[in-house]
């Protein structure tokens, strides 16, 4: 009897080990993509600009990837934010599309967002304003998802950001900075408008805009003092030590002292956390 029970236990463990695990393995074969879902509206800059007064309001949209045949409520969500140095890129780039697909097949709901671009590398403050606009758009996306979490079958307490390069800048700044820490440049000058508070753009939903966790791929932050011990946001970072675009420690973006301010990369963020 003891041998029989032992065999049954071993067989049971073998069966369990052979089964795919949701959120780790691709347990769904098919996904459905809902394209161009509008999550907000905000003033956008032209591709070429010197000052920021010449804007046109645009819809902020995203593509939603979901597993077909999923009956689970309160699913975790991942917001993917693309790269592009704040002057190029969109949510059709291969990496964010592939990540959105494979995450949906693992049982997550993927929200692959577009955000406003606009960077003048000859301006000493354009980079700060570009990151801040991206923060506002990511905030609007999170607030939209939390507002409609029942329609999306999303757990509003399990909304994660996965950013790549510029997208990681957005995720890190949204996670760790507060309204009273916004750069002075975001308040505007005679030729550049006040961008408003972090949650004051895109839509009017009164939801919390902080992510519950963050994946940062070769990102950086503008001020290490923004990171507080009480933030308590789980963060996973990937970064090459010889990255020539975003410094692993501290330095200028693109490794060139032009007009953009110094930023602090993943190694120093890790030490601060």
Feature locations, PLM:
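Bacterial Sec-dependent N-terminal signal peptides
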Residues: 1-22
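Short alpha-helix in the alpha/beta-hydrolase fold that links the catalytic acid
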Residues: 93, 247-273
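N-terminal cap/lid segment of alpha/beta-hydrolase-fold proteins
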Residues: 19-73, 204
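Serine-hydrolase catalytic-loop signature spanning alpha/beta hydrolases and amidase-signature enzymes
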Residues: 85-90, 110, 144
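Short amphipathic alpha-helix adjacent to the substrate-entry channel of hydrolases
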Residues: 91-113
């Amino acid at each position: 009897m003891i041998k029989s029970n032992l065999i049954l236990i071993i067989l049971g463990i073998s069966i369990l080990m052979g089964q795919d695990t949701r959120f780790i393995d691709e347990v769904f074969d098919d996904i459905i993509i809902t394209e161009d879902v509008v999550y907000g509206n905000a003033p956008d800059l032209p591709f070429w600009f010197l000052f920021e007064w010449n804007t046109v309001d645009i819809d902020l949209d995203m593509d939603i990837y979901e597993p077909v045949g999923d009956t689970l409520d309160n699913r975790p969500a991942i917001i993917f934010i693309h790269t592009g140095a704040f002057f190029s890129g969109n949510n059709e780039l291969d990496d964010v599309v592939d990540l959105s697909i494979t995450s949906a097949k693992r049982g997550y709901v993927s929200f692959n967002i577009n955000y406003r671009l606009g960077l003048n590398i000859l301006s000493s403050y354009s980079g700060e304003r570009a990151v801040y606009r991206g923060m506002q758009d990511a905030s609007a996306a999170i607030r939209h998802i939390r507002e409609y979490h029942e329609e999306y079958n999303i757990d509003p307490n399990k909304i994660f950001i996965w950013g790549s390069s510029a997208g990681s800048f957005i995720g890190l700044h949204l996670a760790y900075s507060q309204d009273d820490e916004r750069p002075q440049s975001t308040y505007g000058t005679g030729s550049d408008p006040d961008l408003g508070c972090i949650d004051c753009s895109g839509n009017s939903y009164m939801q919390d805009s902080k992510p519950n966790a963050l994946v940062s791929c070769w990102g950086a932050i503008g001020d290490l003092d923004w990171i507080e011990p009480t933030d308590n946001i789980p963060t996973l970072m990937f970064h090459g030590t010889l990255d020539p675009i975003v410094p692993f420690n501290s330095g200028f973006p693109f490794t060139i002292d032009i007009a953009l301010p110094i930023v602090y990369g993943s190694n120093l963020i890790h030490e601060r956390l």
